[in-house]
From Swiss-Prot:
Expressed in vasculature of roots, root tips, leaves and cotyledons. Plants over-expressing ARGAH2 have decreased susceptibility to the fungal pathogen B.cinerea. It comes from Arabidopsis thaliana (Mouse-ear cress). Substrate binds at H189, P190, D191, I192, Y193, E197, G198, N199, N228, E315. Gene3D superfamilies: Ureohydrolase domain. This is Arginase 2, chloroplastic/mitochondrial. Pathway: Nitrogen metabolism; urea cycle; L-ornithine and urea from L-arginine: step 1/1; Amine and polyamine biosynthesis; putrescine biosynthesis via agmatine pathway; putrescine from agmatine: step 1/1. One of its GO terms (biological process) is urea cycle. Coiled coil: none annotated. Induction: By methyl jasmonate and infection with the fungal pathogen B.cinerea. Binds 2 manganese ions per subunit. One of its GO terms (molecular function) is cobalt ion binding. Mn(2+) 1 binds at H163, D187, D191, D272. Catalyzes the hydrolysis of L-arginine to urea and L-ornithine. The latter can be utilized in the urea cycle or as a precursor for the synthesis of both polyamines and proline. Possesses agmatinase activity. Catalyzes the formation of putrescine from agmatine.
Length: 344
């Protein structure tokens, strides 16, 4: 397993420094051709996987909505540690590790491809090694999500990766469906800075980008316990409904009986694993004590009324997990229950 330094510069970032240096010495036209080929190959891979899974689900029949698992191993927009880039394979392994059965709490069988199908990962690192910038990389993520959604009845459930991926995913869902969605965002942080540390695509700025783009009508943020003046001002600017942990006992009944998505294109759920108290999830980059319990989150998810059209689970950091990968199991459980909620 790769190790990360005190400020979160992972070993693999040093490994790709040499290719970037080499690229700068090549003619621009040659570099652009190489970038186009890698991006085209990535999109073709996602397209063909989605087609295969979509055809299988349609052949079996009886599904109105099927959860399609898509990994986005992106971590360089994190402000601290970049370990979330390593998360997707750990979460997949935990889903199917055999230590628990494959039936969700709502009684759905994950081995049924009509409930959960997997279309693989976007090869983020390979794309970045070609010198592709974040503007274009985010478009690749959005286009990949749209390719999945083209294969009805597939709906995207994305494994991050840091929270910056939520912006291109929500953008794709909204654009593909033709209008805004309502978002339930569970997190210790509001992630709504205009530009955190100057980074337009920072994981701490993803929901500012979403709201600026008009991709959400309502944004409900639950579990917040690390928020400053800018976070509150940005929340007011965009009309965000921010529910902080200090008032959770008062808000609990309402949050466990949410009804979202009426009058818009559906509901999107974004779960940052650090919404949980660190006692329930040690494998995150930012420890924020005083968070939600795992059952708190499941009660909110299970009782939510609305058509779930997309979701993500982000910010699991395998580099900070316990020796027995307990937080991987936590992230996997989120994926399992979201898949049950989305499929029908």
């Amino acid at each position: 397993m790769w190790k990360i330094g005190q400020r979160g510069v992972p070993y693999f970032q040093r490994l790709i420094a040499a290719p970037f240096t080499t690229l700068r010495s090549l003619p621009t036209s040659l570099v652009e051709t190489g970038q186009n080929r890698v991006i085209d190959a990535s999109l073709t891979l996602i397209r063909e996987r989605a087609k295969l899974k979509g055809e299988l689900v349609r052949l079996i029949g009886g599904a109105k909505a099927t959860t399609a698992l898509l990994g986005v191993p992106l971590g360089h927009n994190s402000s601290f540690l970049e370990g979330p880039a390593l998360a997707p394979p750990h979460v997949r392994e935990a889903i199917w590790c055999g230590s628990t059965n494959s039936t969700t709490e709502e009684g759905k069988e994950l081995k049924d491809p009509r409930v959960l199908s997997d279309v693989g990962d976007i090869p983020v690192q390979e794309i970045r090694e070609m010198g592709v910038d974040d503007d274009r990389l985010m478009k690749v993520v959005s286009e990949s999500v749209k390719l999945v959604m083209e294969e009805e009845p597939l709906r995207p459930l994305v494994i991050g990766g840091d929270h910056s991926i939520s912006y291109p995913v929500v953008r794709a869902v909204s654009e593909k469906l033709g209008g805004p969605v309502d978002i339930l965002h569970l997190d210790a942080h509001p992630d709504i800075y205009d530009r955190f540390e100057g980074n337009y695509y920072s994981h701490a700025s993803s929901f500012a980008r979403i709201m600026e783009g008009g991709y959400a009508r309502r944004l409900l943020q639950v579990g917040i316990r690390s928020i400053n003046k800018e976070g509150r001002e940005q929340g007011k600017r965009f009309g965000v409904e921010q529910y902080e942990m200090r008032t959770f006992s008062k808000d609990r009944q309402m949050l466990e009986n949410l009804k979202l998505g009426e009058g818009v294109k559906g509901v999107y759920i974004s779960i940052d694993v650090d919404c949980l108290d660190p006692g329930f999830a040690h494998g995150v980059s930012h420890f924020e004590p005083g968070g939600l319990s795992f059952r708190d989150v499941l009660n909110i998810l299970h009782n939510l009324q609305g058509d779930l059209v997309g979701a993500d689970v982000v910010e699991y950091n395998p580099q900070r997990d316990t020796a027995d990968d307990m937080t991987a199991m936590v992230a996997a459980k989120f994926v399992r229950e979201l898949a049950a909620k989305m499929s029908k």
